[in-house]
Amino acid sequence: MRQVKLLLIFLALIFAGCSTLAQRSSTGVVVARRAQIRSSTAVVAADLLQVNRGDVVDILESTDVPDPNDNTRKERWLRVKAHDEDTTEGWIEARNVMLDDVLEAAKKLAAEDANVTAQASGQLRASSNLRLTADRSGNDNIMMRLDSGSTFDIISWKRVPKPKSSESIETDVAPKAGSAQPGARSSNRQGDEPNEPEETNELWYKVRLPPEISPAPAGWIYGKQVELAVPSDIIFYRTGREFVAWQRLDGDPKDNNSSTEKDGGRESKPGSWLILEKSSSNQPHSLDEPDFDRIYVLGYDKRSQEHYTAYRSPDLTGYLPAKVEGRGDDKSFVLRLQDESGAMKDTQYSLYKDARGVLKVNAPNVAPRERRRK
């Protein structure tokens, strides 16, 4: 009788395991530029099939195996079935695959700003994580690691409280399974460095990515890893303030700031631009500080092949997104500005050309902003 009970318990465990395995079965997409499906998780396993970024695989099961370099840590592996002619089955490191539910979450994130034109373009200074949320206090929201030099469109940005666990860590690179976390920089700085107010908040960019860079169409990137890719046509017109957003005023607004080309759109043909500027400050950044504090419209004379200042606003308080509307010479742009009462208002600026073909801006009355002292 006892043997029968043990057999029943054993069978129940088997069926429970099969049920769990079936529930976890799903699909995933390869995020690594290239990866190998292997015969096993062993170091000496054979390579069965090379898969590339964007390839879809069926996930059959997962397991954690000791890292060969550190037995105190484990690496997660997935047993997958490829969609090749031979339907190859084998094992692949989990970090090389994005699960389908994560990809769906990224698509929903992209849908939130589907009608928003890119506000700027950026490029990674170093390899960095692409996350579902603007939070680097843990690894659960990491979708994939982007390569250094990856380019993307910037849709928006925000500041969030800096995690206490990363007060001294100024990067966002999740370690490969089995490796140590990036070491924190020493907090005992040299006495000859000036004492600056400590930043309690950190900047994050919401980005839109082309398929060749990431299967996930959108995500969040830690701001210190990002270099703004200011177009070569306007980069030399900065006058003490940073260019934080820009859009072309000639051509189709939908074509603005495409980062699918190398160097994130740095090279661009001459033209007219809407540029949003922001003053620099040595004071800590607040969570609700404005995105920009001045509007700069740069015109372009095709005959002389020279740029000129069509409009420069007084100091103001503005927030993204900026939207360019219309076609041809009948265009305008809309910005979210704060009025004298502190209320937010969508403000429209009309564009026109005078008899000589010079670009002009019909600017509404906008409340000037009190400049913050540096």
Whereabouts are the PLM-identified features?
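Bacterial N-terminal signal peptides that target proteins for export
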Residues: M1-L8
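C-terminal motif of bacterial Sec signal peptides marking the signal peptidase cleavage site
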Residues: F15-G17
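Boundary regions of SH3-family modules and the immediately adjacent low-complexity/disordered segments
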Residues: S19-G28, A32, Q36, D70-Q123, ...
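Short, structured beta-strand/loop micro-motifs enriched in basic residues and often containing a Trp
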Residues: A32-A42, R125-S137
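Short alpha-helical segments in extracytoplasmic peptidoglycan/chitin-binding modules
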Residues: I37, V51-G54, L60, R79-V80, ...
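Conserved beta-strand/loop element in small beta-rich adapter and peptidoglycan-binding domains
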Residues: A46-N71, G138-E199
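Short beta-strand elements that form the blades of beta-propeller/WD-repeat-like
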Residues: G271-D288, D330-E340
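Hydrophilic extracytoplasmic domains
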Residues: Q305-K374
